[in-house]
A protein has these predicted regions:
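Conserved catalytic-core segments of large NTP-driven translation/proteostasis enzymes
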Residues: 119, 577
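Surface-exposed amphipathic alpha-helical tracts and adjacent flexible/coil segments at the periphery
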Residues: 1-21, 25-36, 48-51, 57-86, ...
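Glycine-rich, highly charged phosphate/nucleotide-binding loops
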Residues: 42-47
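Active-site PLP-lysine loop of aminotransferase-like
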Residues: 122
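A cross-family signal for key residues in well-ordered alpha-helices
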Residues: 102
Length: 737
């Protein structure tokens, strides 16, 4: 399969520039549902025109629907939004939401579905699961190495698309709530405000400032540039090379595409001569960079060299530098002012007494046109040169004559208008012939479709007692939760039991909890990379046999791993396996999972309309804002593999805890204040969740005891939580954009 160069298009001008510069395909967002809601984007008519524009040039167009959709958006707006694009010939849709994937498969069964990087696919098991659902392509997490990507390539038939150039998020895509929680602008809804690019001071557990002088941007990665890695990228099984930048100007898009096109072609034609010239690296640098470039995660796990820690100084230096006007002039001239055209071969015959006749061919397409009658020349006969000059004025058509043969009488004449008619005739016919195969007719949206049932009946919902559950990440928290009688289930993080004697300690813990009338579920990591859970396969089976209730999972990789073991009915979903809408809920119910977790970004009105009878709702806990492969501890003070807890201080003086999870090599940034839905207990009861949950992450044993007892009193006995602690309400009372 030919390697595809995939370019961003935030506008029609950028799309045309990308195609002119050599992109094989473009991806863009429309008026809704895209992950770059603040890009200019294209309206419906522009997208319909864009679909034909790329198809006439033998390219492809993919539409982003890579956000999480709320109920009314999915049920009322998505079908009419997608239908005209589908019927025009849209090549694929890029999705994040399982409800959207389910709907698109139902409504448009022959439309290719690309699983967005927002799905946080981190291994072959997750990729294989998406393939089984009908996805044709996967965009795995940017954090994966060549070896991990090769495993996906070897074990699935999916096309693999990876980012090769542009901005790099600090967080695993799809796992970021930072912008949402501090400002209401959700990255999962395409409205990220990029708080990660702001300055922060880092402090260790002893309150010492971390890092070198000037390390003020610990969450801001450099842009990625992997043109020098193209041979390794192609060999790894990546078939689509994706350039980031729908918010960027057309000059940036065209400039970057042209350089990657040059070197991709060079490698495919003469791999032994592959070498990137310094002047081309300089051009990429001048088009845009952030403290220089990194080569993404393909060959490294993380590290200081990937970060733009001193970004402010670099930006000051940039302001003093003059833009390379010659570079931008050349890009404007070659790719923006000059549109890509498809070559055609033409054959013209002009003989007196016969109609003027022109045939044209483009690939497998062949058309003909006739116009007027050729007359004997009364004065000056037409010359072949004059005829060719007129016909080759293809203007705004998508074609140019690569070859034009003329067979004509030496003494003939036709008006220039006749030649124009011939040219228009073959051009219009070719356009129709080349776009018609892409057209298709959508079926009407089905009246009845499988979804979660909606809000349950008040009385039937009230019959079932709401449980109190809690999660623990440390042994101290575990011990504290065992003492709280009202807690029926404990979700034990892997850190609750020592790795060296994990099975032994976990078995004792399960039996101990059982004696106290509690169930235990293992809470699996936020991120599971290739092979992370392999060593636990036999352990999980043994623990199930002695009474383990099941597993609380945070990602597709964990689900797929357990599904392969036949344990899908022992699974509960955490918040990060999103169930924003009833179709997503129904999808996971069909997969056999026991419960989901109410998404943190839904507000009280939206939760109230939801069927929560198989859902848990988190009412206490420090909410995770970022899950990252990077490590503040390592990047600023060096790796100590000690599960460090550091704090980031923002410009407003707020402190955000950052916890390292060294066994799985990732870190989590938590909100500055814990969620505490205290006064909302009665309202939450009326929403009929199966359980409310307390999440403990950084709390001490004493704090865990005190908080768990207080919330147990409120939710189980109606006792008010004592004043004294400060909480946030999260999104319970405010809507995300």
């Amino acid at each position: 399969m030919k390697t595809e160069l995939l370019a961003p298009a935030g506008s029609m001008e950028a799309l045309k520039a990308a195609v002119s510069a050599g992109a094989d395909a473009v991806y863009l967002g429309g008026a809704a549902f895209g992950a770059r809601a603040y890009a200019k984007n294209l309206d419906e008519q522009e997208i319909l025109s864009a679909i034909d524009y790329v198809h006439l040039r033998n390219r492809k167009l993919y539409l982003t629907v890579n956000t999480l959709l709320k109920e009314e958006e999915l049920e009322e707006k998505l079908y009419p939004y997608l239908r005209p694009y589908y019927e025009q010939g849209l090549d694929a849709v890029i999705v994040q939401d399982m409800g959207v994937l389910k709907a698109v498969r139902s409504w448009f069964p022959d439309l290719d579905i690309h699983a967005s990087t927002q799905m946080t696919v981190t291994g072959s098991a997750g990729a294989h699961f998406l393939e089984s659902l009908g996805a044709t392509r996967v965009v795995p997490a940017r954090e994966l190495s060549f070896a991990e990507i090769q495993k996906i390539h070897r074990t699935t038939n999916l096309e693999i698309e990876c980012f090769v150039h542009g901005a790099l998020c600090y967080c695993y895509s799809g796992q970021c709530l930072f912008s949402s929680l501090i400002g209401g602008r959700s990255g999962n809804r395409g409205r990220c405000a990029q708080p990660c690019r702001l300055p922060y001071e880092a402090y260790d557990k002893d309150n010492h400032r971390m890092g070198e002088l000037g390390d003020r941007y610990p969450l801001s990665p450099k842009d990625m540039c992997t043109v020098e890695l193209l041979p390794e990228i192609v060999k790894s099984g990546i078939m689509s090379l994706k350039i980031e930048g729908r918010m960027k100007k057309p000059e940036y898009t065209a400039g970057v595409v042209s350089i990657y096109r040059k070197y991709l072609d060079l490698y495919e034609k003469k791999p032994s001569r592959f070498r990137v010239l310094p002047e081309d690296m300089k051009k990429l640098y001048e088009l845009y960079n952030r403290d220089g470039f990194n080569k993404s995660y393909y060959t490294v796990r993380n590290g200081r060299d990937m970060m733009a820690l001193k970004n402010e100084k670099e930006q000051e230096n940039k302001k003093k530098q003059r833009r390379n006007e010659q570079l931008f002039y050349e890009i404007q001239r070659d790719y923006i002012e000059t549109e890509a055209k498809e070559p055609i071969s033409g054959f013209l015959t002009l003989y007196p007494g016969q109609p003027a006749f022109l045939s044209a061919e483009s690939g497998k397409y062949s058309v003909t046109a006739e116009a007027g009658m050729v007359e004997p020349a009364k004065k000056q006969p037409l010359t072949e040169e004059r005829v060719k000059t007129q016909l080759e004025k293809t203007g705004e058509t998508p074609f140019y004559f690569k070859e034009l043969d003329v067979c004509m009488d030496d003494n003939c004449f036709v008006p220039m208008q006749t030649l124009n008619e011939l040219r228009r005739g073959v051009s219009d016919q070719l356009v129709k012939e080349m776009t018609e195969p892409y057209r298709r007719k959508a079926a009407e949206k089905p009246e009845q479709e499988a979804k979660a049932s909606g809000k349950p009946d008040q009385e039937s919902g009230a019959e079932k007692k709401m449980e109190l559950t809690a999660s623990a990440e440390t042994r101290a928290q575990w011990n504290a939760l065992l003492e709280i009688t009202e807690i029926t289930t404990i979700y034990a993080g892997m850190g609750c039991f020592k790795r060296e004697i994990f099975e032994e300690q976990a078995e004792k813990g399960i039996l101990q909890a059982k004696e106290l009338g509690k169930q235990v579920y293992l809470m699996l990591p936020h991120v599971v990379r290739e092979g992370d859970l392999k060593e636990y396969r036999d352990t999980f089976r043994c623990l199930k046999e002695i009474g383990l209730g099941g597993f609380l999972i945070r990602n597709l990789e964990s689900f797929s791993f357990l599904k392969e073991m036949g344990m899908e009915k022992d699974i509960r979903l955490d918040y990060s396996v999103y169930t924003y809408n009833s179709r997503a809920q129904a999808f996971w119910q069909e997969q056999g999972v026991q419960r989901d977790t109410v998404p943190y970004e839904l507000n009280e009105r939206e939760i109230g309309k939801r069927d929560n009878t198989n859902s848990e709702m988190v009412v206490y806990g420090y909410l995770p804002m970022m899950v990252s492969a990077q490590c503040v501890q390592k990047n600023l003070n060096g790796c100590n593999h000690s599960y460090s807890l550091v704090r980031l201080k923002d410009r407003m003086g707020k402190y955000f805890p950052v916890k390292s999870y060294c066994t799985s090599c990732y870190s989590v940034i938590y909100n500055s204040l814990p969620l505490g839905l205290v006064k909302e207990a009665d309202e939450i009861r009326s929403m009929h969740p199966a359980a409310v949950r307390l999440n403990f992450t950084i709390e001490t044993l004493e704090e865990t005891k005190e908080i768990a007892a207080a919330f147990a009193g409120t939710y189980c006995k109606g006792i008010a939580v004592p004043a004294g602690r400060e909480y946030t309400k999260g999104h319970f009372h405010r809507k995300v954009e």
